């Protein structure tokens, strides 16, 4: 199977809107190449891990790369993307650019290696590519070895980072956890590293499930995590202390009631993948169902919301 890489150069003001448009049109992952990164702005957050190649970045603005299954990428989809992006009021059409290229699946692993290096994703979690060696900086540092494959979820997106921080704060070793839309399995691995022993990872995409299983093996937790294909929480009969979902807002809307019903009393629903503009709608829906909102965090235009199931 081949993949269509869509490369779009835009101004910073519309970055989050364009990313959301691509994800809502079911892209299989997004890469951000920000011209500001060449100024060293990431150094304070992630440390001096590697040097950036200026040739990989636009002269100005942001290059957003999205990946679609070649079979699914049609002229109709292209026109819809162009129409939605060009309708953005703040779009600077002087720098706007839209390009496409086919990437063979056999080349995908090497393509990702150009972007993926060790970095600190949260207070205690560091993400380490499976093809690189890394020396822990302290005993408290928890390293997740990862090969994103085609499932993405490398931890460098603000939503994943916020979920990792929420997991550190709200997940206990004694908890049972279900990770909905597990992708590369990063959030399930994080729970395992914190001592959780009852974890279920679910994804609708069979490829994502395969990649997640491979990453569980890399982190020696394949026997501790139940992995399965499934459509959100539909058909789930077990109860859990924590439901985690880092997926798009309109999908989260569909599963809020199921998340509430799947949780034990005082269980926690950790959810992200929500642009700030849609966060109030999600929060109100969660409250109507019966959740007590215990945490709301924002990062770069995205929100992470944690709700607790109120005892009846």
From Swiss-Prot:
Report the EC number(s), separated by commas if there are several: 2.1.1.-
One GO term in the molecular function aspect is:
protein-lysine N-methyltransferase activity
Which reaction(s) does the protein catalyse, per the Swiss-Prot or TrEMBL entry?
L-lysyl-[protein] + 3 S-adenosyl-L-methionine = N(6),N(6),N(6)-trimethyl-L-lysyl-[protein] + 3 S-adenosyl-L-homocysteine + 3 H(+)
This protein's GO cellular component annotations are: cytoplasm
- Keywords assigned: Cytoplasm, Methyltransferase, S-adenosyl-L-methionine, Transferase
Q: What class of enzyme is it?
A: transferase
Which protein family is named in the record?
A: Belongs to the methyltransferase superfamily. PrmA family.
NCBIfam families found in the cross-reference section? prmA
Job of this protein: Methylates ribosomal protein L11.
Protein name as it appears in the record: Ribosomal protein L11 methyltransferase
Q: Which organism is it from?
A: Staphylococcus carnosus (strain TM300)
